[in-house]
């Protein structure tokens, strides 16, 4: 009994000695579990598995063909082969990703025709399952990166950052575009998010390396390059703390040459390893990556400035042809050749050109408004991106960098040439990490996410996809708009704001659902009344214009805060 008592007492003493450490470890473990994305991944994966048998777009055949191209052909023919119309038009690193996937194709999937290099693939359920699973598996990287983002947040920021991380992981864009329409954006944006996390931790070389990898995977990230370039230049390469310009020699000493060599060496090495094997076919590769022969707008107008421009052209054309004296009024204000010289010329232009309502991808011509050239879209994009990156030169903070990154994405989406509606993720993903800083950013963020996600609905035009896309997006907006309102910190200046814009934005967001239901009802009527068949473009136009209003307003709101609300960025 004595020995037993001694053992018990010793155990109690040792337990008391371990107590504080055990409590701390238990609290840390409990906190880790509280902010874990594991349950979200399990639940979302279950939903994605259920969606496997559903609709998929021609992008499924695109990626199947790329598997075949990279598996069957030598390197020098990857960007030359035109057996299928779905030619390889992503950067080489993504081509290597497709090659890696082709190496693990099971025998049953091979026999199903997954790796056949043909003009039009013929495959069945095994190929569908395999390719769907590759999207789900590759998206794991996004969850891992977001978990790192949450775990390495400061304790007081962990809750709001957890909300941001789950909002990105469960984004309707990734569900609709990747797991129904079929693409690999979750994997691609995971690399971009990793570079953002590295920037927050001031690991500048890693940030530059990861962004270079992302760029070599998906060339649309080139639109974000100005923000990365200026941020890394100012934060890592230049030492302007006590800089005083007296002579040009001072500029030499303002450069941290060792840092420049490290960062530049890593970036150039990644680019060299990626593109060097394709040096012999570089012209063909560049032509695939940047096809300026395509038109200003896609077959479905992306909700940007050019959608509104195209809509105004349609309205002016209608008014000048149908309403008396409108043309005379227009010519009294604007003289030819800025507008057509006569009504007959308007009719001739309508008969001759593609005006963006025929679902064609080639160049679009306008009837009333001036024609738009690629050079103009480039200059507009560059102008607004320069405005976005200039503040980073004076304040290379992480907050300024994310604001600049979001506005660079906005500029490219709103004013770029042949922008796809899916490119809205180029804006939403960076903005998601920005909104966590201040409640003043919530209104433009709500406008962007609501209108941006709804603008993706026409991608899934099958009736079976209607309920899932509307219901999932509606639930996401309700949950995350309210969660961010509760968790994002508010500053003192919020109390001095005029809330009319916020209320107007709330009305706009609420009217998105009636717009979607109204367009669906119009589509149902088209099948019953032949007279409505010639107005099939009206539904897509409603999506484009209404969503473009939200995206453009969000851009203007963020631009105002970025350039004129100085306390927000301190």
Curated annotation (Swiss-Prot):
It is a multi-pass membrane protein. Keywords: Endoplasmic reticulum, Glycosyltransferase, Membrane, Transferase, Transmembrane, Transmembrane helix. Residues 1-34, 149-161, 200-212, 284-300, 397-412, 480-497, 558-570 are lumenal. InterPro entries: Glyco_trans_ALG6/ALG8 (IPR004856). GO terms for molecular function: dolichyl pyrophosphate Glc1Man9GlcNAc2 alpha-1,3-glucosyltransferase activity. It comes from the Eukaryota. Residues 1-29 are annotated as: Disordered. This is Dolichyl pyrophosphate Glc1Man9GlcNAc2 alpha-1,3-glucosyltransferase. It comes from Eremothecium gossypii (strain ATCC 10895 / CBS 109.51 / FGSC 9923 / NRRL Y-1056).
């Amino acid at each position: 009994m004595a020995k037993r008592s001694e053992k018990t007492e010793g155990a109690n003493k040792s337990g008391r000695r371990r107590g504080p450490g055990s409590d701390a470890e238990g609290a840390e473990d409990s906190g880790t579990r509280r902010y874990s994305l594991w349950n979200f991944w399990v639940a979302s994966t279950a939903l994605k598995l259920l969606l496997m048998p559903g609709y998929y777009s021609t992008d499924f055949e695109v990626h199947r063909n790329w598997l075949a191209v990279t598996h069957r052909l030598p390197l020098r023919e990857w960007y030359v082969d035109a057996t299928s119309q779905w030619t390889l038009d992503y950067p080489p690193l993504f081509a290597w990703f497709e090659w890696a996937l082709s190496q693990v194709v099971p025998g049953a999937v091979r026999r199903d025709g997954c790796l056949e290099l043909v003009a039009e693939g013929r495959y069945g359920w095994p190929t569908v399952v395999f390719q769907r699973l590759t999207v789900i598996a590759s998206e794991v990287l996004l969850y891992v990166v977001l978990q790192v983002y949450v775990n390495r947040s400061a304790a007081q920021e962990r809750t709001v950052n957890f909300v941001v991380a789950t909002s990105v992981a469960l984004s309707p864009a990734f569900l609709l575009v990747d797991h129904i329409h079929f693409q690999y954006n979750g994997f691609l944006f995971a690399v971009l998010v990793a570079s953002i996390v590295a920037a927050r931790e001031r690991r500048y070389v890693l940030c530059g390396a990861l962004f270079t990898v992302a760029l070599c995977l998906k060339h649309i990230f080139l639109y974000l390059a100005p923000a990365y370039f200026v941020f890394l230049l100012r934060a890592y390469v230049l030492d302007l703390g006590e800089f005083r310009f007296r002579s040009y020699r001072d500029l030499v000493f303002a450069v941290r040459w060792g840092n420049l060599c490290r960062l530049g060496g890593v970036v150039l090495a990644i680019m060299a390893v990626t593109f060097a094997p394709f040096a012999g076919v570089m012209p063909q590769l560049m032509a695939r990556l940047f096809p300026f022969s395509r038109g200003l707008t896609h077959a479905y107008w992306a909700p940007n400035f050019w959608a509104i421009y195209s809509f105004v052209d349609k309205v002016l054309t209608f008014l000048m042809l149908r309403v008396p004296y409108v043309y005379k009024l227009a010519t009294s204000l604007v003289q030819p050749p800025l507008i057509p010289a006569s009504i007959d010329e308007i009719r001739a232009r309508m008969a001759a050109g593609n005006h963006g309502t025929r679902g064609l991808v080639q160049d679009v011509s306008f009837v009333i408004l001036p024609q738009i050239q690629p050079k103009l879209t480039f200059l507009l994009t560059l102008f607004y991106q320069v405005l976005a990156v200039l503040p980073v030169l004076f304040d290379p903070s992480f907050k300024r960098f994310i604001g600049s990154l979001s506005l660079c994405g906005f500029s490219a989406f709103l004013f770029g040439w042949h922008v796809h509606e899916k490119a809205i993720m180029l804006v939403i993903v960076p903005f998601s990490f920005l909104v966590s800083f201040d409640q003043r950013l919530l209104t433009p963020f709500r406008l962007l996410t609501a209108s941006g996600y709804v603008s993706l609905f026409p991608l899934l035009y099958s009736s079976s996809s209607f309920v899932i896309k509307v219901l999932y997006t509606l639930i996401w907006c309700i949950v995350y708009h309210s969660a961010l309102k509760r968790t994002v910190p508010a500053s003192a200046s919020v109390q001095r704001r005029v809330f009319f814009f916020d209320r107007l934005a709330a009305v706009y967001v609420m009217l998105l659902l009636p717009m979607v239901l109204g367009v669906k009802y119009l589509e149902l009527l088209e099948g019953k009344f032949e007279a409505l068949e010639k107005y099939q473009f009206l539904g897509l136009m409603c999506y484009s214009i209404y969503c473009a209003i939200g995206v453009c307003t969000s851009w203007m709101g963020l631009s105002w805060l970025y350039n004129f609300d100085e306390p927000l960025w301190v």
